[in-house]
Regions:
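ATP-binding N-terminal substructure of ATP-dependent carboxylate-amine bond-forming enzymes
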Residues: 1-66, 70-79, 83, 95-105
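Active-site nucleotide/adenylate-binding loops and adjacent lid/helix of ATP-dependent enzymes
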Residues: 5, 25-26, 70-160, 170-171, ...
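Glycine-rich phosphate/pyrophosphate-binding beta-alpha loops
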Residues: 40-41, 125, 184-185
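Short Gly/Pro-enriched turn/cap motifs at secondary-structure boundaries
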Residues: 42, 119-120, 155-156, 224-228
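Short hydrophobic/aromatic-enriched beta-strand-loop microsegments
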Residues: 59-63, 89, 174-176
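Phosphate-binding site of ATP-dependent enzymes
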Residues: 132-218, 239-247
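Conserved metal-phosphate-binding beta-hairpin within the catalytic cores
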Residues: 224-249
Length: 249
């Protein structure tokens, strides 16, 4: 809504007709064969583009509408994952703009301190705060609400942060990429600066026991199947040091 798209050919620009995602060159109309979606956040990761392309019958590179919408909603995804056997996720609660907010004391009683307060729908750690005191709770909620009308408040997970990506081959086999360990350079958590400004080291393969790596790969493949994913995905984990207690972050 409110955007114009163009196909670029050198210095020439050809406007895209959003009614059918086609464009015209020298009186001849052209259609796309495939959409490789690389847009972060909305509308690329929350099901909006996927639904649009489904209506047009245009194949694309990501999971479908339901999976993208669910995985973009942190609180809904955590609740779904919590229902799966053997999957561990951090305790959390959600607050919404316009609703009565619990008091900082009630929030801390539920999730403890430190905790993380983050936009429920968003990426790149925009609006995320690590909260250590009661006085910081409400400012962190208001900060997160600058990015989203829904805010998730989550118990802190302590441990080593790792990430595991995977994809499905045409024969149905789900293949995991090498596991990566995220080592911060002095920051409090894996925030925007750590992700994009070089304030973290990403170590591949991760410095973890092979038995742990096997469990992480198996969990990643299991979640991929249960969600019905398509294309390449990535799941982040916190290793707590307890065998079998890898928690999805």
């Amino acid at each position: 809504r409110g955007h114009e798209l163009h196909v670029l050919d050198g210095e020439k620009q050809y406007p895209i007709d959003l009614r059918d995602f086609s464009y015209e060159v020298d009186g001849q109309r052209h259609q796309f064969d495939f959409a490789y979606i690389t847009i972060h956040g909305t509308p690329g990761e929350n099901g909006i583009l996927q639904g649009y392309f489904d209506l047009l019958g245009l194949p694309y590179s990501t999971s479908g509408v339901l999976v993208e919408a669910l995985t973009f909603n942190k609180f809904a995804l955590n609740n779904y994952l919590r229902s799966l056997p053997g999957i561990h996720v951090s305790d959390s609660l959600m607050v919404r703009r316009g609703e009565n907010l619990p008091s900082p004391a009630e929030i801390v009683e539920r999730v403890g301190l430190p905790c993380f307060i983050k936009p429920n729908a968003g990426g790149s750690s925009f609006g995320v705060s690590k909260v250590k005191t009661l006085d910081d709770v409400m400012p962190a909620i208001h900060k997160a609400m600058n990015e989203s009308d829904e805010v998730m408040i989550e118990r802190q997970l302590v441990g080593t942060e790792i990430t595991c990506g995977c994809f499905r081959r045409s024969n149905g086999e789900i293949v995991c990429f090498p596991i990566t360990e995220v080592a911060l350079k002095g920051g409090e958590f894996f925030d925007y600066d750590a992700k994009y400004e070089g304030k973290s080291d990403e170590i591949t393969p991760a410095r973890i026991a092979e038995s742990t790596a096997d469990r992480v790969r198996e969990t990643t493949q299991y979640v991929y199947r249960q969600l019905g994913c398509y294309g390449i995905i990535r799941i982040d984990y916190i290793l707590s040091g307890e065998r079998g207690q890898e928690q999805i972050n």
